[in-house]
Curated annotation (Swiss-Prot):
Belongs to the glycoprotein hormones subunit beta family. One of its GO terms (cellular component) is cytoplasm. Its main location: secreted. Coiled coil: none annotated. GO terms for biological process: G protein-coupled receptor signaling pathway. Promotes spermatogenesis and ovulation by stimulating the testes and ovaries to synthesize steroids. This is Lutropin subunit beta. GO terms for molecular function: hormone activity. The lineage of its organism: Eukaryota, Metazoa, Chordata, Craniata, Vertebrata. Residues 1-20 form the signal peptide. The gene is LHB. InterPro entries: Cystine-knot_cytokine, Glyco_hormone_CN, Gonadotropin_bsu, Gonadotropin_bsu_CS. Disulfide bonds join 29-77, 43-92, 46-130, 54-108, 58-110, 113-120.
Length: 141
């Protein structure tokens, strides 16, 4: 009996600590600061820009009997409200538009991944790095 009471007390204390902090144990989907590499085919430089992207956890479920039932749609942390900013890459030859746009997350949500606007995961062919020499400093429009 004493062992059961001790176990119950330990469980209540551990849950109380999580409730008292009022912070989720895992960060939910929200905008975070990130650095992106920006380059364009035909331009000889790469620039890094600071922006906000969506990151964090979204609740998901998996079926126990996957062979019998169709899979449940999985949600990801994605943009709710987004604006695009543009920069001008220096040194682009004539005939190449030097303007490149990148997303700035204003708010995020958990929802289906849209390949048209998001990286939906999976293996990458190459890391997200610059192919051209990196230039410091930004030329915002």
């Amino acid at each position: 009996m004493e062992m059961l009471q001790g176990l119950l007390l330990l469980l209540l204390l551990s849950m109380g600590g999580a409730w008292a902090s009022r912070e989720p144990l895992r960060p939910w989907c929200h905008p975070i600061n990130a650095t992106l590499a920006v380059e364009k085919e035909g331009c000889p430089v790469c620039i890094t820009v600071n922006t906000t992207i969506c990151a964090g956890y979204c609740p998901t479920m998996m079926r126990v009997l996957q062979a019998v039932l169709p899979p449940l749609p999985q949600v990801v942390c994605t943009y709710r409200d987004v604006r695009f900013e543009s920069i001008r890459l220096p040194g682009c030859p004539r005939g190449v538009d030097p303007v490149v746009s990148f997303p700035v997350a204003l708010s995020c949500r958990c929802g289906p991944c849209r390949r048209s606007t998001s990286d939906c995961g999976g293996p990458k062919d190459h890391p997200l790095t610059c192919d051209h020499p990196q230039l410091s400093g930004l030329l915002f429009l």
